[in-house]
Amino acid sequence: MLQSPAQRYQADLDSGAIVPDEAQRITVDALQDLYLRLEDRAQVKPGLLDRFLNRSRSAPEQGLYLWGGVGRGKTYLMDAFFEALSFDKKKRMHFNRFMQRVHEELTELSGMKNPLDAVADRIASETIVLCFDEFYVSDIGDAMLLGGLMQALFDRGITLVATSNIPP
């Protein structure tokens, strides 16, 4: 049976697998809240008119950016959140791998008008929740590309959860 992020965290505390940490508790509370909102939305099925008018995607639930030092439990907490989600349209990947995929798709779509929209459409067809481990952008070109892509994903109702060692 699936455990919510809060249940998983508490079970791991009770078993001694992890030690209590106030920052983790605060993060678990935020992940639990997001988890509950996403699960509620997953239960609502769009009607025929909504599908006809392409209104099946509403505004995304605001995601989370988990940052802190190495070894603080960010990836563990994000994974607990990801594993708890009961629906299949979710994706978890290392951020570097995601950027490789984006660059590959942009190369494939070169010459197309608005290729970022096509990439966003592909991603949105696969997932409604996108979890990135080790989110980090150092290249100005990637930063500019990500600005447009993230907006396109949010416009398509995608919720983002990311871990990083770098403050926002």
Language model feature labels by segment:
Residues 66:
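Hydrophobic anchor at the beta1->P-loop junction of P-loop NTPases
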Residues 74:
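Conserved lysine of the Walker
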